Amino acid sequence: MATSKQNIVFIFADQQRNDVAGYAGDRVAITPHLDRIAEHGISFTNCVTSSPVCMTARTSIMTGLQIHQHGVWTVSNPELRHGQSHVRNIRDAGYRTGIVGKNHLWPHEGGDAREHANELLEWGWDTDL
């Protein structure tokens, strides 16, 4: 019998602390959907962001590099898509990859993310949902 791979769903909500969710015991935050996901998955309780700036933090997550190594302080560097990418590693391991929502992997100038489809492929995503 072939073993199927577990799904990997990475939810990143703009540097939200892990304890600001119902499943983590917060009595103010009402997060029923996250609570259900956490009940059947993994929550990284000791994970910290590299930056309070979302674009900088996302670049660190994508590349595995610290801020002083990738140099992105405000606007992502599109050339980083040619380097190491955890999404590309996941895709190369046989998973289908996709992204939903904002990603800030290029300067936002309005328009449609589909205009950057080739860049998403270079980062390692199969599709922009």
Protein language model features and the residues they cover:
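Formylglycine-dependent sulfatase
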Residues: M1-L129
